[in-house]
């Protein structure tokens, strides 16, 4: 009997009444998933992939030879193809090797890992930092480590999926407050007190990336002080360029030193590679090193990424030129869109969603923009709520005003073509 025919064989099992039931065949099981994907396509929600062959940059070269202006990367500081970082990575490969083949507490800690943790702590003004394979892992390994069934987590309704999943893993009581709504946050803090929570932790994104809205972190910290709660911020879409010196949402909101836990990524503005971190109070970081499962059971950050990241933070401390240019080009782009009648969410962040609402319209709009030479992607359910489809555009420091003019011109042309 072949392996496939064994899969297709109808098996039998007994139910709780002792009756024999037929089990679904393997093909029947797999057809469930096929139908699910077909439904996604029919609803206009299918997320495809468009491979490119060049480094990530303001422009990318596609497999078919086309060169597109990239307007959808998290490459905020334009460092994905930076020669200085590439050279630092090459140098680290020569000095430290390709990988460490171990977790941190066995034999996976090199000196550059400790140096990078110290460098991040110094940049953010925190006590200590712990590195992860990604920020998703940082968030996934946070809540179950520091919260128990006696505690409560109060989470913004628009938090990133990694926070949502991380909260699901812990046994703490869960409260969700309306996006950036301080009145509702206070109500949930009161509910947590009434429930007898021992520790209260407020969890929020620093920037809500689907909308480009910056968190009211001062309001969050004020309420945390009032109700004796800890504050956790995922600053993945902020560190490196938000705030006068790029130190993130806490700097932007004037609450440096008042945030207990900052999680973030090395995979967006900070070079665009991979890796994450949790930075904050020493007592919390110490416990994470002992108990956080993604840290204990995942390989250490690749040496080349650690080495290049050290170089990156040196660059950020030397000059704010990149974030200053990004701020200027973002303001120009936002004004051009508004002046030409596009529906965008007001703000200052370089993540600028162009609202189209209908899922199929957004998908077709993105397709036509690609045909005109602009790489954008339609965002639809479940990434955003149903009926809130959009083209999420993202400015980077390597864009020029001429690039912005071309992008807006293409937006206008596609709008006219689609009526």
What kind of region is each of these model predictions?
Residues 227-230, 237, 242-348:
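Active-site C-terminal subdomain of aminotransferase-like
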Residues 324-331, 338-373, 383, 387-388, ...:
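Conserved PLP-binding catalytic core of the aspartate aminotransferase-like
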Residues 12-22:
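Short, Lys/Arg-enriched N-terminal segments with co-localized hydrophobic residues
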Residues 35-96, 229:
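N-terminal "arm"/small-domain region of PLP-dependent enzymes with the aminotransferase-like
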Residues 142-161:
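Conserved PLP-anchoring active-site segment centered on the Schiff-base-forming lysine
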